[in-house]
Regions:
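Basic/polar N-terminal segments that are highly enriched at the extreme N-terminus
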Residues: 1-7
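Preference for short coil/turn "hinge" residues that link or interrupt alpha-helices
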Residues: 4, 12-13, 39, 134, ...
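Extended, charge-enriched "interface" segments that sit outside catalytic cores
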Residues: 7-10, 15-125, 129
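Glycine-rich phosphate-binding loops that contact phosphosugars or nucleotide phosphates
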Residues: 116-248
């Protein structure tokens, strides 16, 4: 398909100063506003030919219809025959997204509400000072990125930690500085069978049980998963399991 996509013109040889001098309206013209986003492109080394070429290339590559197919819940993940609807997680409560006869928005907000209520309880529980996310891949990188980006807004009592490496030194180093009584673990695994994640989770569980006893697991572990049976078997209260869907 890409062989049929038109080429993009070469970057202009003019400097930014020359581009602004040649086009006094550049600062106003090269701005895109979408919802709450304002994207300023005027200081990028582009000109009208580049913009037109990029738009044509996107058109040739069927970007718009493929985007619309994704938003509509079509199964564009052809490898696993699944929809790709991470966008549904950001839809407002009053939106509607019906896929194969089911409106996904109420389901999404049911989980978001449960997450919000749980987060409020943790903020109010002065016993908890440290939260350890145990995951790998997207179950580690995504939460770690969000925590880093929003660090200035976190609760001053709560500290976040991330464990993903199956090398035992990673989890051991993290646990060495923590108090079992004030630590909460989040085990993030869709199937609750990911080897790396479960290995680290079992290490953390043993560390907690050794200090506080078996009953403490239900109070100090929560799960992000779709497998209630395995989550319960680990000792986590399924009321503290936050689910998601194959299309995420």
């Amino acid at each position: 398909m890409l062989a049929n996509v038109g080429a993009v013109p070469s970057l202009p040889t003019a400097t930014l100063a020359e581009l602004f001098a040649a086009d006094p309206s550049r600062a106003e013209r090269y701005v895109i506003e979408v919802a709450d986003l304002r994207i300023v492109l005027s200081r990028q080394p582009i000109d009208d030919d580049i913009v037109a070429g990029l738009v044509q290339r996107a058109t040739d590559a069927l970007v718009a219809p493929r985007r619309d197919a994704m938003f509509a819940g079509e199964r564009i993940n052809v490898t696993e025959d699944r929809a790709v609807l991470h966008t549904a997680l950001r839809l407002p409560r009053d939106a509607e997204l019906v896929v194969e006869g089911t409106d996904l928005v109420p389901e999404v907000h049911e989980v978001l509400d449960a997450m919000g209520a749980f987060a409020d309880r943790i903020r109010a529980d002065e016993r908890i000072t440290d939260i350890v996310n145990i995951g790998i891949g997207g179950s580690d990188l995504g939460p770690a990125m969000a925590a880093q980006a929003l660090d200035a807004f976190r609760h001053p009592r709560l500290r976040g930690h991330f464990v993903s490496n199956i090398d035992g030194a990673d989890v051991a180093t993290t646990l060495a500085g923590l108090d079992p009584a004030s630590t909460l673990f989040i085990v993030a695994s869709k199937t609750f069978g990911t080897i790396e994640t479960l290995t680290n989770a079992r290490t953390a569980r043993a560390w907690l049980v050794d200090a506080l006893g078996e009953d403490a697991v239900a109070d100090h572990f929560v799960a992000v998963s779709t497998n209630a049976e395995r989550v319960s078997g680990f000792g986590i209260d399924t009321a503290n399991m936050f689910g998601f869907w194959d299309w995420v």
